[in-house]
Amino acid sequence: MTNVNPLLLVGAVIGVVTALLVLACALVKDKKETMSFERTMNDGEILRRLAGYAKPYLAKFVVVLFLMLFSIAYDIISPLIVGALEELVSGEFELPRLFAGVAVYAGVLVFSMASTYFQAVILQRVGQRIISDLREDLFTHIESLSHEQLNEIPVGKLVTRVTNDTNAISMMFTNLLVTLTKNIFVILGILVAMLALNYELTLMVLCFVPFIVIFTVIFRKFSRRAYRKVKDATTDINTYLSENLSGIKVTQIFGREDEKMAEFREKSQRLARANREQIFVFGVFRPLVYMLYICSILCLFYLGGMGHLNGVTFLGQTITGGTIVTFYMYISKFFTPIQNLAEQFNWLQSALASSEKVFSIMDIAPKMVDAPDAIELDEVKGEIEFRDVWFSYLPGEWVLQGVSFHIDPHQTVAFVGSTGSGKSTILSLICRNYEFQKGEILIDGIDIRKIKISSLRRHFGQMLQDVFLFSGTIRSNIVLREEGISDEEILQVCRYVNADKFIDKLDHGLDEEVRERGNNFSAGQRQLLSFARTIIHKPSVMILDEATANIDTETELLIQDSLEKMRSVGTMLIVAHRLSTIQHADNIIVLSHGKILEQGSHQELLAKHGRYYQLYTLQYHKEQLEG
């Protein structure tokens, strides 16, 4: 009976620990979590789509699997070699055989290390290429979405999909899938080798497997919970930082730094607590698996030692010193991949969830697509016609109602009206940023729906009130990566739109740095750069949407002079805030609630004493009072 006491002690320890973990798992109640993303794809569908990106690199994956066989072989063969060497040393010692055994072991080790190195290099290269392909497809798809669709998706969400989520997918190709495959084969290979060597000791090792399964199930529950907490806290703090760093000037103006710091500290501490919980979960799981490993080693030494001393085990198996050494190494190599499998499963689920988020964006069908018979426009004269056009952003809420007008080539036409009258909407429809529900819009007598979108927009130049400048230089913001444009052409255009007056004063001229969104330039300077960017691409139709709003008087005079020059370039459409800037327009269209009230020249509309006359009179008196 005393011979069994050590085994009973080991079993009691494992049983108590397992019971405590099961009790803890039962007591911890899962809170019903509100997931910001509901999964709609099954794992098989996701893997099939990812396989499409991996297919071009199938040959390289085959090479990786071939190289992986060497490292698997090392894990299975090396314990047998060490066991044989132990028996050689403890038995009839022969130096040549010892050298031969060491040489074989060293050779297997070198091949394993080399294969592992090349396997890692190939996987990293292939994985990054796959993710690069995926990112490019995702970015291209985002570019194809309409303005309406882009308005519905937060920019931060798109950035996360292109960066963070694709990084999570990258881990699956560069590490997880191959490691999971290798671990499974290593476990199976070790089991076969142990059974062939000594089935009694193998059965002893397998007695610990149920406890590993229990620990793994419990670990998965707690690790998922901890992982979600970290993810939620990270998202929360990133959102807070994005908003408050953008509005930090407002915080400073109102002196609310301490209050904002208190909010940030609370969110930062929440993230720290979540990270500590995740570390604790992993910190508990690894020692538990290690405890099982130590217990199995103790049982090995006890049963193996008893069998070695007695010459035979309980089931009649013969155990040598080499067998014990071999099993000692096998047990170590058996528990390590099992521990890795449990941890990597969570990362795999995370990668699959990230994949679904990426595919959910790629599955959004663009609302603005070319017709099957769409044509290319080699040139545009600039004739524009609206025929009974109706449009609404939301069903039943018409923004434009039966709008009809005609614009001749090289005419300058202004759209006037109160906020929400439909001015900017008309300009957006001309460029096919949105799809109208009824009527026709013609360019040079051709329905714009029969023209390729890229071809149509290539002939338009849009200048908006909120000018967007990219980080880079003045030159890069004007040419927009179009090749073949010389500095002389750029400077000529800058002089044409009066942008040279401030560019010449800069230290680096066209190479002057442009910071994020062009915040190191004034609103007027950004607008002049926008004019230069538009003119250099030689548009046939120019669109100015509130381009002279919020600009000082001196800059407005420069812009007015630029506009006069630009009228000769092509057809010009203007949405004006200041009516004084459109007095020389060939035609002024007055809108109200999506309908055209009146149209004509400046003098003709004043003579009518209608809505335009009222707007002009009010604005004139306001300017007189301000003056």
PLM segments and residue spans:
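Juxtamembrane helix-loop junctions of ABC transporter transmembrane domains
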Residues: 26-43, 66-67, 74-87, 108-155, ...
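Transmembrane helix-loop-helix hairpins at lipid-water interfaces of multipass membrane proteins
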Residues: 1-40, 61-115, 195-200, 311-315
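ABC-type nucleotide-binding domain
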Residues: 363, 370-371, 377-627
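Hydrophobic alpha-helical transmembrane segments of ABC transporter permease domains
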Residues: 2-3, 74-78, 84, 115, ...
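Short intracellular "coupling" helices and adjacent cytoplasmic loop segments at the cytosolic face
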Residues: 55, 93, 128, 136-160, ...
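A short amphipathic helical element positioned immediately N-terminal to and/or at the very start
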Residues: 43-56, 158
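An intracellular "coupling" helix at the cytosolic face of ABC transporter transmembrane type-1 domains
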Residues: 55-59, 147-148, 164-173, 177, ...
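Helix-loop-helix
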Residues: 92-94, 100, 193-207, 277-356, ...
